[in-house]
């Protein structure tokens, strides 16, 4: 949408810009309450060269004009490589009215940078009427300050998404979805749809800590076929969505339970062994999903938009990393090693693919609990949870931790203190350091570990990854470096930023006659729920 104040020639008036329309959508989401159980949900994406971007940043703020705020509509920013390079180089950033630079929205990579720089010259020559100039680093600080304060906007990278897409022959990808793992093109005739499934990694880890690779391969291939069947039997009420589903047959296989299996294997989340395991598992799942889609194409035919796609040229997700490096002009810091025979698969996919996309790693925040494992790629947020069900509220302790402490004969002696300390084991010297390293929680891990895990997986994933970030720091300059590293490592998207609370509730123990404080080291604690432990009188 054109910027606020942009002239509307047909009516001799001025546009109100995109913000009021976003408010309308926000109100509609509130109206769709699903019997009061859950409000509707949607996400608005904006490129940060839009003249009204500063107002977009304020949408989720608590203060200010309520008519210019959204309470249900999530927000995300679509960032170009041109902007990131200007942040790194300390250069200015120009904001334009889309009415005067109408083609920018459809461009990406080198084509975007070239055209954007041409518009800068036109603006400086007085040939563009409405524009603003801000230091690129200043705008990046504003984005990250808003992210810290409100959790929005999520950061996504337009060029990594489009340049690495194998299905971009049908148009530019302009946005992701509510969880930032789906990257599909759409237009007025096509509403993008994707059919998702998440594999529970824990189900393929044997009791002797070896992997059942054969069973995992069979499950991936079965899931690919089941999702493809689902496309044909699903009743899609919106014609544009049905058309997109039929023309692209997009799938999104992902997985959950990473932290769960790392604990069972006694591997620290921030170790090279963990990064290599993510690399190996994601490559394996990607290989068998792509191969099975090629098999389906031979049986049932390719998806209608196959011709002209990256698949039709024999390209695979790993092949697009070099393309991103070339267009960006900056090497993408991704290790391109592989373990499987991808060359044979390159020749196979040229002949046909049943599905435009195969992989997307979702957050699985809810279904992972049903499956009894950890969500997506995320580490453990806490070792103790308060879980609410229809039968009431109860505590749940990480079963892997309990099992390990019992093996060390420490559970009975430490369980009360662990409950009082919200499950944080880092301050307990009785527990070996190697065990404490394995059971670090979200805010105790390096943020660069989150980036490394996502980067290792992203090189094999043709769509994107829902990557939550957890930070204890409130230093925006540190945020700039962390998110710049995510860009350098080739991440396509990030999701919520969780910042450790400044304050935590005081913990107490209860006796029959008195209440006394529990000594805790706040520097070694993690956020979570408050608990009390009962002493025997």
Name every feature range the model reports, one short phrase each.
Residues 1-10, 14, 18-21, 31-35, ...:
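Function-dense linear segments that define catalytic or interfacial modules
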Residues 37, 219-242, 246, 268-364, ...:
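Internal maturation/activation junctions in enzymes
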Residues 180-185, 227-232, 334-339, 347-518, ...:
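Catalytic alpha/beta core of large soluble enzyme barrels
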């Amino acid at each position: 949408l054109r910027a606020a104040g942009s002239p509307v020639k047909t009516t001799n008036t001025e546009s109100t810009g995109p913000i009021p329309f976003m408010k309308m959508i926000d109100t509609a989401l509130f109206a769709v309450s699903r019997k009061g159980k859950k409000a509707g949900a949607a996400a608005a994406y904006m490129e940060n060269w839009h003249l009204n971007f500063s107002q977009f940043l304020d949408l989720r703020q608590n203060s200010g004009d309520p008519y210019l705020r959204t309470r249900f509509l999530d927000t995300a920013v679509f960032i170009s490589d041109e902007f990131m390079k200007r942040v790194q180089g300390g250069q200015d950033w120009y904001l334009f009215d889309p009415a005067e630079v109408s083609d920018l929205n459809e461009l990406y990579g080198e084509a975007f940078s070239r055209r954007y720089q041409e518009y800068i010259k036109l603006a400086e020559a007085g040939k563009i009427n409405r524009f603003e100039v801000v230091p690129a680093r200043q705008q990046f600080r504003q984005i990250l300050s808003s992210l810290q304060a409100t959790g929005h906007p999520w950061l996504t990278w337009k060029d990594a998404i489009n340049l690495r897409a194998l299905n971009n022959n049908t148009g530019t990808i302009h946005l992701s979805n509510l969880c930032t793992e789906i990257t599909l093109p759409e237009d007025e005739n096509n509403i993008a749809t994707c059919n998702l499934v998440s594999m529970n990694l824990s189900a393929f880890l044997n009791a002797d800590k070896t992997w059942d690779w054969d069973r995992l391969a069979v499950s991936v291939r079965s899931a690919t076929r089941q999702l493809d069947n689902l496309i044909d039997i699903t009743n899609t009420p919106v014609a544009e969505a049905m058309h997109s589903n039929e023309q692209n047959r997009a799938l999104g296989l992902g997985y959950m339970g990473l932290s769960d299996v790392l604990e069972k294997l006694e591997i620290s989340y921030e170790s090279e062994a963990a990064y290599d395991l993510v690399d190996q598992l994601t490559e394996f799942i990607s290989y068998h999903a792509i191969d099975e889609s090629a098999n389906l194409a031979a049986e049932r035919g390719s998806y209608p938009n196959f011709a002209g796609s990256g698949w039709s040229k024999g390209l695979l997700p790993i092949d697009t990393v070099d393309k991103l490096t070339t267009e960006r002009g900056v090497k993408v810091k991704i290790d391109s090693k592989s373990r499987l025979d991808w060359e044979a698969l390159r020749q196979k996919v040229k002949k046909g693919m049943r599905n435009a996309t195969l992989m997307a790693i979702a957050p699985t925040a809810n279904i992972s609990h049903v499956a009894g494992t950890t969500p997506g790629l995320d580490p453990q947020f806490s070792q103790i949870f308060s879980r609410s069900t229809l039968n009431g509220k109860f505590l749940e302790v990480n079963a892997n931790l309990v099992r390990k402490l019992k093996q060390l004969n420490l559970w009975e002696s430490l369980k009360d203190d662990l409950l009082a300390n919200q499950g944080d084991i880092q301050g307990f010297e009785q527990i070996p350091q190697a065990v404490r390293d394995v059971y670090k929680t979200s805010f105790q891990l390096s943020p660069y570990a989150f980036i490394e895990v996502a980067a290792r997986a992203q090189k094999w994933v043709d769509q994107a990854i829902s990557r939550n970030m957890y930070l204890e720091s409130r230093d925006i300059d540190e945020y700039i470096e962390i998110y710049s590293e995510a860009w350098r490592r080739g991440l396509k998207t990030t999701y919520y930023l969780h910042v450790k609370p400044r304050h935590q509730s005081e913990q107490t123990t209860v006796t029959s006659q008195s209440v006394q404080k529990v000594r805790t080291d706040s520097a070694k604690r993690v956020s979570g729920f408050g608990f009390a432990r009962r002493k025997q009188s």
